[in-house]
């Protein structure tokens, strides 16, 4: 149940290898299901990042996406049989906007390369629903949950706990240390 419109822009459009086209098709199917469930409050579109922008604006836009976690992948595509390969950039990500806030989803996060073999496609497709639902839940939440960690008795913060806090918890929760001394 969404109180306002959620706008989703997916950056999977244009001339791409078949693995990315399959990912785009799966993403569109999922977003169509979300639209049906969310009534008129889910809107989505597919676009080629920076299309129609001047070079400077396009570089600024791509830099903004990279800072949000959507990084371009440079891939080799065969132009025509016997003519060799051409390098292209593909940005497998989405930008979700809601009430003046925005968040980004890297559809290939967790993947080591942009080589779209069957295993990578299946893994990426399996995580699509979670990634979009999680991002929509985060961006539409009114408050961010708070976690407190008790410190005291001369104990130091272990590297495992520090890694957990920085790597996982800070992206989803507010975090505070509570001294018990």
Segments predicted by a language model, with ranges:
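Short, surface-exposed patches at the edges or C-terminal ends of soluble domains, predominantly
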Residues: 1-181
């Amino acid at each position: 149940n969404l109180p306002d419109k959620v706008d989703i822009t997916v950056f999977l459009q244009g001339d791409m290898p078949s693995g990315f086209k399959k990912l785009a098709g799966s993403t569109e199917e999922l977003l169509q299901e979300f639209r049906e469930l969310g009534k008129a409050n889910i809107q989505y579109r597919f676009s080629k990042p920076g299309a129609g922008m001047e070079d400077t604006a396009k570089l600024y836009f791509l830099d903004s996406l990279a800072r949000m976690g959507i990084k371009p992948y440079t891939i080799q595509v065969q132009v025509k049989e016997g003519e060799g390969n051409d390098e292209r950039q593909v940005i497998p990500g989405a930008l979700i906007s809601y009430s003046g806030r925005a968040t980004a989803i890297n559809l290939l996060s967790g993947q080591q390369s942009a080589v779209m073999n069957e295993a990578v496609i299946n893994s990426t497709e399996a995580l699509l629903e979670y990634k979009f639902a999680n991002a929509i839940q985060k961006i539409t939440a009114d408050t961010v949950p708070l976690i407190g960690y008790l410190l005291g008795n001369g104990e130091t913060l272990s590297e495992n706990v520090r890694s957990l806090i920085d790597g996982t918890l800070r992206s989803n929760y507010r975090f505070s240390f509570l001294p018990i001394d």
